[in-house]
């Protein structure tokens, strides 16, 4: 959960709010100036992840897996990777390196993602959604 403190709120008010919200999920206090960036990342992010899961599933189907199996495997893979990032606190790049063998299948797949500019495309999507949020906020 995300919250911003009002102008008259004290630091203690912010800490209390964070503690209360943390009881039902992860809570972050951010400056109002960052709310559009939060929208670009977390507000629009689920759609990006759904599209990635769909593409991963499509790849599985192209490789011969039945659609239902491919979709479940793709979703479980994303869930497991996300849990590892959250539970270990390690940088995603470090976790990626831990599962990438020299000359193996994973590095071959990662090379294809780099050729397709996956990272740049995702970064640009977050930036575009952030800018759109700013424009919508201006009326």
Where are these regions (language model features)?
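NAD(P)-dependent Rossmann-like dehydrogenase/reductase catalytic/cofactor-binding core
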Residues: 75-139
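Aromatic-residue-lined binding/catalytic grooves and analogous aromatic/hydrophobic interfacial grooves
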Residues: 45
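Phosphate/pyrophosphate- and phosphate-bearing ligand-binding catalytic cores of soluble enzymes
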Residues: 42
């Amino acid at each position: 959960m995300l919250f911003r403190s009002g102008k008259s709120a004290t630091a203690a008010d912010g800490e209390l709010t964070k503690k209360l919200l943390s009881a039902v999920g992860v809570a972050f206090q951010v400056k109002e100036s960052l709310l559009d960036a939060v929208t670009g990342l977390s507000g629009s992010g689920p759609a990006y992840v759904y599209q990635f899961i769909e593409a991963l599933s499509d790849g599985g189907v192209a490789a011969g897996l039945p659609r239902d199996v491919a979709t479940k495997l793709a979703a479980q893979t994303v869930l497991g990777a996300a849990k590892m990032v959250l539970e270990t606190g390690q940088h995603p790049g470090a976790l990626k390196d831990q599962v990438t063998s020299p000359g193996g299948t994973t590095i071959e797949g990662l090379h294809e993602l780099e050729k397709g500019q996956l990272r740049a495309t995702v970064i640009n999507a977050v930036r575009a959604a952030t800018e759109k949020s700013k424009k919508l906020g201006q009326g």
